[in-house]
Amino acid sequence: LSYGPVDLAGFRNWLAQRYQSVDALNRAWGNVFWSMQYGNFDEVELPNLTVTEANPAHWLDFYRFTSQMVAEFNQLQVDILRELSPGRDIIHNFMGRILDFDHYDVGAQLDVSSWDSYPLGFLDQMRDLFPEDHRLQFARSGDPDFQAFHHDLYRATSNGRWWVMEQQPGPVNWAPNNIAPRDGMIALWALEAFAHGAEAVSYFRWRQLPFAQEQMHAGLLRSDRSHAEAFAEAGAVAEMIRNIDWPATTKGDVALIFDYESAWAWRIQPQGEHFDYFSLVFDIYRGLRRFCLSVDMMSPAVA
């Protein structure tokens, strides 16, 4: 997040449009508490430098504002691309467990949503989500549900069309421990994505770099253009899916709402040290999968 003067001016303007009057803002935020009433919108500061704890409503509106700015910037680029390259699908890639903006708003502007799937990197990196014994158990295969959760979530953001934009092909360079996948996992991860409705699975990288920041990040080819371990598995999947009669997309057994504003509210004022909205919904998702139920993620706006 940015907290500069341009952000402050934009936030004040956004509040003025949202509430129309400062009295309406004071009522909505409950500013009578601690005598926090504003006389005009120019008195509102950003929530990061308040003398004491900021009003939770102040923070929540700031998150709403910054999320809308992300969506507006994306829309600006979408409009340019649609004008200069009409008739083509527009796609953008999201990430795992990123809650800083409402992905439904951005996804609605796209033809195809996608995300970057790094099963081993995410497992070892997200240590607050995965305890040590769990990380050791799945160190070379990735958490059994994390990828599926995001497949279903991002499928919901752009009316069912989605890709894996970056699929892990081997050890990465950015996790605490960059472990090689177990034999067969490259193929399994791709097949899992297709089973969740992916139109495409794209690997990052095609060829490993011999220099710079990501030179230790594996590709389907090594830097000398020889085949890395993942090359054969990716090729096998390509042959496999040519001969699979994929069923028509159907509704899941269960709908599960994922709400970004709820995630922000939990972050702003958690009622326990380890309260985390993502973890709550993820645990529910895990439980549904244990009962062999397919899950459709939904925005609260369409629930």
List where the protein language model places each region:
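Carbohydrate-binding surfaces of carbohydrate-active enzymes
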Residues: 38-44, 118-121, 132, 136-303
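Polysaccharide-binding and catalytic clefts of secreted carbohydrate-active enzymes
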Residues: 1-153
